């Protein structure tokens, strides 16, 4: 973690992957967030028939960890510090992490199935 002017910064490396049917998903590659602030990771996908949309986290040297998922008939799902927003019309998925912590520094993947 880097410290600058008394602030701690978290680096969320964002990478994307689709876990079935070779569908495409897109998201930004890098996000820097000050510890304690909220962060939003965005993802777009192509398959409007997807039933489930997932967010995974991968810490250095570890395997993928399922953070949360949302059914395609839902608009929002909240679980502790995580909020998932789904706009099925625009094929847009967002993950909001409230009160970011050093343990949130990782690679994040969105996926659809």
From Swiss-Prot:
In the record, biological process GO terms are: adaptive immune response; response to bacterium
Question: Where found in the cell?
Answer: Cell membrane
Per UniProt, residues of the Ig-like domain are 23-113
Query: Which Gene3D superfamilies would you find in this protein's record?
Result: Immunoglobulins
SMART domains linked to this entry = IGv
Chief subcellular location equals membrane
Q: Which residues are glycosylated?
A: 42
GO (cellular component) term, any one: T cell receptor complex
Renumbered to this chain, the signal peptide range is: 1-22
Here the disulfide bonds are 43-110
Keyword terms, alphabetized: Adaptive immunity, Cell membrane, Disulfide bond, Glycoprotein, Immunity, Immunoglobulin domain, Membrane, Receptor, Signal, T cell receptor
Q: Record's InterPro entries? A: Ig-like_dom, Ig-like_dom_sf, Ig-like_fold, Ig_V-set, TCR_variable_domain
Per UniProt, subunit arrangement is: Alpha-beta TR is a heterodimer composed of an alpha and beta chain; disulfide-linked. The alpha-beta TR is associated with the transmembrane signaling CD3 coreceptor proteins to form the TR-CD3 (TcR or TCR). The assembly of alpha-beta TR heterodimers with CD3 occurs in the endoplasmic reticulum where a single alpha-beta TR heterodimer associates with one CD3D-CD3E heterodimer, one CD3G-CD3E heterodimer and one CD247 homodimer forming a stable octameric structure. CD3D-CD3E and CD3G-CD3E heterodimers preferentially associate with TR alpha and TR beta chains, respectively.
The record ties this protein, via PANTHER family, to: IG-LIKE DOMAIN-CONTAINING PROTEIN-RELATED, T CELL RECEPTOR ALPHA VARIABLE 1-2
Question: What biological function has been recorded for the protein in this entry?
Answer: V region of the variable domain of T cell receptor (TR) alpha chain that participates in the antigen recognition. Alpha-beta T cell receptors are antigen specific receptors which are essential to the immune response and are present on the cell surface of T lymphocytes. Recognize peptide-major histocompatibility (MH) (pMH) complexes that are displayed by antigen presenting cells (APC), a prerequisite for efficient T cell adaptive immunity against pathogens.
Tell me what this protein is called.
T cell receptor alpha variable 5
